[in-house]
Every structure is written in C-alpha cells, then in structure tokens.
Amino acid sequence: MSHVAKVGVLYSTEGPYASIGRDCWDGAHLGIAHARTQAAPSVDLQLVSADPRADLSRYLSEAQALLRDHGCRHIIGTITSAARKEIIPLVEKHDALLWYVCPYEGFEANESVIYTGPCPNQHLLPMLDYVMPRFGHRAYLIGANYVWGWETNRLARQLLHESNGEVTGERYLPMDETDVDRVIADIRTKVPDFILNNLVGPSSHAFLQAYHELGRQDPRFHPSSRPVVSCNLTECELGAIGSGIAEGNLSVASYFASLGTPENRSFRSAIAAELGPDRSPSAFLATTYATARLVAEAITLTGTDDPVVIRSFVTSHPFETILGRLAIDHRTNHASLPAHVGRISLKDTFDIVMSHPPVVADPYLAHPQGQGAIRPGQDRHLRIVS
C-alpha cells in the first residue's frame, strides 16, 4: 500500500501581485506533476491547492484548512512577507514546513521554513555591486509601503552610507497605488545616479511607465544613464508594464529565462509544452518548480513526509535543479543561490550582464561579505557578461 503525502500550495492568482502568484502556482503544479512521473510506487504524491485572493485573513484560514482539514505537512506558498509571517505560527503549531520561494528582506531564519528564494546578500548586494561602479553612488529609493519596501530600502541606505554613497530621496507607495507623478517630479529635481525600485505590482508598473515617459522628455533619465534597478522584477510582469517600456532598466534574480544552459533549454521546452510557446518562465516559476521537485524528491527518497526527516534530508543533500546545484544551509534553512543581473531588452526579455556563482545565504548579514561585497575593487569572482 502506497504512502499518501499531501503537499499544499498557497498562492494568490488575483490582486496586485497576481502575475507572480500565477507563475508560482504553475511552477508548483508542474513541479509536482513532473515529480509524480518519477516517484516510487510506494509514495502517492497529492497536491492540495488554495487561493487566498490576496486577502491576508484568507491566507490564515486557507493555511488552516490545508494543515488541519487536508492533512498537509508541507505548504509551498505565500508571496509577501506579510502573508509569510501571518501563517508561520500556524505552521509551527502543526509541526509542518513552509517552503518560501520569493525574494525577501532577510533577518529571519525559522526552523519551520525552508527559504529557496534569495535574501539581500543574494539580490540587493549583487545589484549594488554591479550598479554603483558603473552609474554612481547617489540613489533614490522607492518601495512598497510594507516590510519588503521598508527593510530593503533600510539596508540599501546603510550599504550606501558605508560606501560613501548618498540617498537623494525615499518614497513609499501602497501596492495598488498608480499615482506616481510626485515621485517622478522629485526624481527629476534630484537627478540621482540610479533609482532602487522596491515597489510591487501595479505601483511598480505605473512607476516604470512614468519613468519611461520622463526619459523620453529628458534624455538625462534614459536608463542607459540613470537606470531603475529592481530586486523583484521578472519576466512575468513585463507584459503588464507594456512592450518595450522597461527597456534598459535592470533587475537581479537567481534565474532568467534567457540563461543559455542546456538544462534551461530543456526546461523552457517543457514549459512551452505545458503552458504554451509564448510563456517565458520567470524566477518565480522556476524557483517554485525547483522547490516542488525538491519536496517531492525528498519525500520519495526518504519514504516519508515527516517534516523533521525532510528538513534534515534537504539540509544535508544538495539537489540539482534548474537554478543549479541547490544546497540548503542547516544553520539558516536558506538555499545557496546564483545571482544574475539582467538588462531588460526591447523584446521584454532579460539580457544577462553579470552572473555570480551560488552565494551562501547570509540572512542577517552577519559575515564580512554582507558589508563588503558592494565596495568596488574587491575580488568577488564575479563574471561580467557585458
């Protein structure tokens, strides 16, 4: 008789971050579906999905249903830090594991969470490392008015200060706010070297559209001179911004669809076969896919979905994934991840301009790399592509 292992999926496919949620949803479902074809007959992998519709209170009730009513011992889910923090106490209460795939602001390490998304030394630091020597040390910070925006900009402010940089301005907007005229006017007045964009969803789209228009009116603000740089912008949002609108701006991620590896070509073919030839996988889709495969493989190889056993297994056995060799540190439950900086092309893809080999996560920036990685002139073994 086969052992039934239920894995919960908890993503919003509606609301201000719907495009991210859809990519995560699809990545989880495809990852489990592909894993089931290779699972041992003794393991019956079952997926139980819930959509909180971007309602914070529903995250809690849906997570409760997955854990208590359906008997899931693993949940792949949540996008925002607010949602993650909302359900962690419930996950702890049920002795379960939450698998979190999104970039976040760091300063967290919980034994009930496996973090396969990047923390600041895997996204913000590599981005500043690339941008500051090329464009300058004067930054304008704009962010979503919640913990992701606050904390990421706080870290950026600290890192800029340590590198003799300057914050020329700092603004925060709700995720669904699209009136960015005052922010654009302030940027035009202060003329920063680059803009660090930590907005989410419609506010980010509106800002990039308005900045594109500013660049058309005033050549000083063309992205080739003063780019907008992001730590959470991927392929899944470029269509909503508008064709070619974000061209020349930069983002950092552990995966871009343009990666030229044989593994990525095979992955893209599989995605095209399942989701259509026009679907360009983002880091959200790829990371959720890799995470779902990791969960399924760990359950299959150990023969149990016991979270204690699975956590011990995944923190002691590296896995080959579409992101590369994924190793999870037993001290922090965070994955080592590559960092790629991509420049948005006219075709709404990312041209990779810098790649960093897998970086060990340092969620509390406790090691020298956390404060020294962005200082020009240090040997950091970066591979500059262009």
Placement of each model-derived feature along the sequence:
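Beta-alpha junction/loop-to-helix N-cap segments that form part of ligand/metal-binding clefts
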Residues: 23-24, 38-106
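Solvent-exposed, acidic/polar segments of extracytosolic/periplasmic ligand-binding ectodomains
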Residues: 5, 322-386
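Periplasmic-binding protein-like
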Residues: 67-79, 99-101, 140-141, 191-207, ...
